[in-house]
Amino acid sequence: MKKDKLKNYILTAGIHTVAVKSQGAVDDVQSEVEQCITASVHPGRKGSDMSTTSIINPNKLFGDLYSFDECCTAVQTILAGAGIDDYQVIRADMRFDSPDLNHYREFQKLNRYLISALAVAYKVKNAYCSVNLFSQKQLSVAVKNKYFEIENYDKAAESHGKDAAASRFEIRSKFFCEQDLKKEFTEVWKKRFDKALKHLDEVHGAYNDALEDLYHDGLASRSVRFRSMTDFLLQWQDCIFCKKQLIEFLERFPDKIKNPVSYAENFKKRYKIEYFSEKDVRFAVEEILRAARTFFDAKKVQEGVQEGVEYALFDKEPEVVQS
């Protein structure tokens, strides 16, 4: 990827939602916070107590929050308004946003590369992308397993331009060994990304296997899907991430491609396919982690979310949960 383009990969982080589990039913949420929480009551089984899973969006209280301190204040305010004082965090989402309307299209292939590396590294089976029904433009790429989810999506399209974010990269943790969000998103996720970066070659192989199947299926189709190898590669260029991968793909067709290296070089020169190095992917990872650290270390408190002000909404001050 060109350096002048990569430098525009800039993200702002924040907690999107937090899910907590509490005992008993949550059925008396005060009106001041009811738009911030969605509660699902689970009846007890075989003598077990009833429990409630509550999904909290702290940004709906006073607007988007860009520091962990103000996020905690908002979450505690919402919990107090819902009458929840004893709970366990069972899921949390962190968002990485850009307001740039071009950001999603500019970096969707780079983000796809990174997300694919996570899928390969952790052998994730639930991996998919979505497209607009009519334009066929990519809307999202996501992978999900028991422990985590990661998704990059066109936020402008999803919100119809109503959200300040135009592009969103989101990571979700669904299994917590410790109730420590900072550690989860700055340390646990760093280990996941580091592991993913070691599997880029396997990403190439996974895509090449799929592309080979698509090529043979296209040749066998009664309708013409492509007229040549060049046509095919242009159709699927978003699944080819580097010169090495393209050469290895072309080597699978010795009867059609006599000189894969020369073919790959000419294809790049003529059609300007976008390639990435491991350094490019690492740059994206470092920006994601930088944005996360900035969020957790920020001390600025948004106006209207100051300690004391929010508690005035309720008769009883919520207990502060130690991290």
Residue ranges and their predicted role:
Residues 1-246, 252-253, 276, 280-323:
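Structured, helix-rich domain cores that form ligand/interaction pockets
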Residues 248-251, 256-269, 274:
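Helix-turn-helix DNA-binding segment
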